[in-house]
Structures are given as C-alpha cells and as structure tokens.
C-alpha cells in the first residue's frame, strides 16, 4: 500500500497481484489510487503503440531470432565482452601468453567450460556459446580438468588430476568464481571468499604448474582473492564478469594478446572481514569509526581493499600531461540570503544560491600518450575531492573518457567541469552544497587543484 501511494505503478513480480486486494479491503490504499496506477501504466503502453492494431504490422513487429543473431550483433557481443574484461594483476608481464612459448595450456576450474553461466541473468536465448576452454583451444593445445564438479566445490577429489595437468602444460589458466546459484535475485552470498575448496584448488595448482598460472574470475560481484594477490606463483589475475555468449573468445583474445584489456572495475573489492562490520540493516554511506562502521562504496569507505574501484591494467602504458586547467574560480551569488549564509565560517554555499546558469564549465585539457608497444584503449577516470569536511566524501567520480590510442600516438581529452554539478556534495541532511576552498581533480595519475571563492553578483531581493 505504501509503495502504491508513493507512486509505484508497476510490479514486475507477483507481490501486488497477491496483496493489493487485501490492502484495499483494509483501507490501506484506495481504489482511486489503484486506478491511477493502472492508468499510468496503460498510458505508457499506449504511447508505445501497444494498442495500435496487429502487432506484426508495426515497425518492429516481425523481429525474431534471425534479427538478433546477425553477424553484426554477434560481433557486438564479442566486443562488449572484450571491453568488459579487467586485468587486475600482471606480474612480470606474464600476459599476454605466446602461442610459440605456450604450446600447451592447462585449462582448469569449474567455470572453464561453462555456457549458460556466462550469460548471467535477465538475458534471452544466446545465438551460440564459446566457452573459455573452446576459446583457448583456438590458440593452442589444451589439457582440461574441471577440478570441481561445480562452483560450490564441496570436495577436493578431482584436485590431483588438475595438478597433474598443470605439471604437463607450458601455462595454466584457472577459470574460477561464482554463478547464479550463489549470486542472483533472491540469492544472498554468504561471504566474499571463493566458495568451498576453490581457494585450495587455485593454490595447489599454482604450486604444481611449471609455467605461468593465470587466474580468471567469473562473477558479478567482488571476490576476496587476497591469497592469490599475495601468491607470487599466480602470475596474473583477470576479472571477466559474466561475459556473455562470446565470453570464451574474448577471454582467449585477451590471454593471447589479440585484444588489449582496457576495462575498469565497476566496484570496490573488499576483504572478507568487511562484511562482519556492515550490518545488512544499516545502509548509511558515511563511515563512523566511533562504532566501527567502515562506510560504503569508494566514496566513503575507509579501510583496506583487495582491489579498488576503477582499477584496470593494460598491456601498454599511458602518460598524462595537463595542458590546460583553471586554478581559481569565482562563484557568483545572487541573493542577500545567500551572502549571509556563505560566510567563511560555513565555508559552503547551497547549490540553490549561486547563479549556476551563469557559470561556464571549467575546461581542463589533458594530453594522453600511449608510451608502450601495443595499441590500447584507455579509460580516463576523473575524480573530484572536496576540501576537508566531516560531511564530504573522500572523492567522487565526475566522469570518464574512453579513447583508443595507437602506440606512440597522443590524444587530447577535454574535460568539462560544472561547478554546481561536479564540485558540490550532499551533506548529512540531504542538502547539496558547494564547499569553498581548494578542490582536487584526480585525472588518471595527475592531480590538479581548483580553488573556489564567492563573489556578489546581481542581488535579487
């Protein structure tokens, strides 16, 4: 009842269908409010043309599987999988592998030959699958051992065969991680570690491997793989998400250097003990050290991480150079009240007080050069950090720019910083404010500082 009264018009599950009638009988919601929800839903359907006669006569009425599985769409699925792969660790430039030096590769793990797992949830029928094993097999000879019967990995009976495969191969690829039996809608994870005996399998195979050991992680959420990060025998770590129908091809392309990884982590990877300090019932974002609460997300969390939000390595290297950027900006105020509320004591102004429309975006120009030996795609992340304040986040992502740069080439990126939008923060009371003083822009490995001050514009009384 509360949800409908608050404006929820549509429930894609059965909850409203089951409980709404009883809510009306008890007087918790009126029939008029139900009618409004129905009218809003049907209005959208009408705007979409769903009541405009025979569906097959509409512009998209005859689309079917043959339209989904065109070569262009299948290529798009492959490209999306490639771009989504994140290289987290690459010791001694172990990757990419070489078809000349790594003629036999052991492919091990419960996700090494999966199909539907790669699709994740909320997906249609795939046009076809290429598993990681099949993808790697297009480059080199493979020796396959699952190691575990599934991702739950409840026993270690198959570990001996996996170790034997690693001893015979020139390189070993472990494809581990999760699936929808562990993380999905209505399914909560028990922790952040690899399930069951997966960690034991990884460590034992890494000890047995005579060549580089590559850990490929398939999951939707973060995994605490501190053990692998700290194990020098594990040469590289890759996260592939749930890469879709072409996942196996994309993984192999990255492993053997046909594609250069350029993805970035879309979330922070926390250590396992993080969840012990984070009650499910507490959704506060800001950290509270007094009660041992670590905070949520890269914006507020204080503590160690396995891998930070935005991390993503490449097979090439990029250099950044600040070509242009303002250092001092005046924020015009437009009311006497704003002037009174924007003293040096408060050190902030409400976003509603400046004339935001009169503020042109701040232009920051950065030159990005590919200084390595391989063409690559680089995602330039731009973070802002406000002046110190208890109400402020440590940093926030204001934007990103994705550019493909050939080896030895350089491109200029223009970053438009909107003061009211990008340099404002929300305080504890939900009020958006612009902190005065020195703001830091973190652009790749560059830092640039912009100082904000106020000035009195045209007064509106």
Swiss-Prot record:
EC nos: 3.2.1.-
GO MF term set: hydrolase activity, acting on glycosyl bonds; xylan 1,4-beta-xylosidase activity
Tissue distribution of the protein: Equally expressed in the abscission zone and surrounding tissues of both fruitlets and leaves.
Keywords linked to the UniProt accession: Glycosidase, Hydrolase
Pfam families: Fn3-like, Glyco_hydro_3_C
Top-level taxon of origin: Eukaryota
GO biological process: xylan catabolic process
Expression triggers: Up-regulated in both the abscission zone and surrounding tissues after wounding due to embryoctomy.
Protein purpose: May be involved in cell wall metabolism, related to senescence.
Family: Belongs to the glycosyl hydrolase 3 family.
This protein's name: Putative beta-D-xylosidase
């Amino acid at each position: 009842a509360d949800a409908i009264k608050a404006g929820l018009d549509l429930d894609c599950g059965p909850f409203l269908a089951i409980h709404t009638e009883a809510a009306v009988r008890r007087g918790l919601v009126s029939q008029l409010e139900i009618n409004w929800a129905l009218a809003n839903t049907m209005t959208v359907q009408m705007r979409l043309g769903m009541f405009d006669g025979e569906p097959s006569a509409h512009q998209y009425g005859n689309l079917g599987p043959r339209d989904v599985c065109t070569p262009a769409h299948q290529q798009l699925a492959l490209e999306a999988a490639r771009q989504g792969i994140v290289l987290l660790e690459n010791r001694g430039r172990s990757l990419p592998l070489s078809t000349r030096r790594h003629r036999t590769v052991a492919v091990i793990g419960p996700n090494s030959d999966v199909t539907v797992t790669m699709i994740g949830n909320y997906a249609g029928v795939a046009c076809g699958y290429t598993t990681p094993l099949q993808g790697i097999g297009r480059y080199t000879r493979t020796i396959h051992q699952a190691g575990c019967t599934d991702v739950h990995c409840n026993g270690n009976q198959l570990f001996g065969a996996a170790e034997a495969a690693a001893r015979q191969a020139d390189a070993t690829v472990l494809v581990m991680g999760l699936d929808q039996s562990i993380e999905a809608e209505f399914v909560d994870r028990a922790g952040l570690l690899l399930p069951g005996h997966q960690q034991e399998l990884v460590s034992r195979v890494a000890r047995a491997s005579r060549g580089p050991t590559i850990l490929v992680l398939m999951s939707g959420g973060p995994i605490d793989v501190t053990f692998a990060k700290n194990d020098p025998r594990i040469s590289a770590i890759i996260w592939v998400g749930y890469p879709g129908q072409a996942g196996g091809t994309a993984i192999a392309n990255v492993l053997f250097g046909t594609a250069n990884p350029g993805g970035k982590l879309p979330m922070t990877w926390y250590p396992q003990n993080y969840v012990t300090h984070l009650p499910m019932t507490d959704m506060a974002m800001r950290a509270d050290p007094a009660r041992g609460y670590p905070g949520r997300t890269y914006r507020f969390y204080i503590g160690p991480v396995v891998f930070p939000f935005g991390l993503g390595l490449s097979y090439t290297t990029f250099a950044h150079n600040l070509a242009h950027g303002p250092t001092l900006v005046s924020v015009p105020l437009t009311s006497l009240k704003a002037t009174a509320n924007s003293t040096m004591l408060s050190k902030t102004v409400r976003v509603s007080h400046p004339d935001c429309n009169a503020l042109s975006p701040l232009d920051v120009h950065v030159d990005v050069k590919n200084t390595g030996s391989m063409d690559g795609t680089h995602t330039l992340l731009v973070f802002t950090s406000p002046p110190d304040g208890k109400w402020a986040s440590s940093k926030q992502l204001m934007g990103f720019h994705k550019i493909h740069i050939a080896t030895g080439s350089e491109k200029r990126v223009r970053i438009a910083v909107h003061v009211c939008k990008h340099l404002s923060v929300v305080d504890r009371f939900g009020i958006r404010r612009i902190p005065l003083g020195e703001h830091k822009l973190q652009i790749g490995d560059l830092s640039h500082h912009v100082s904000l001050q106020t000035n009195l514009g045209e007064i509106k009384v």
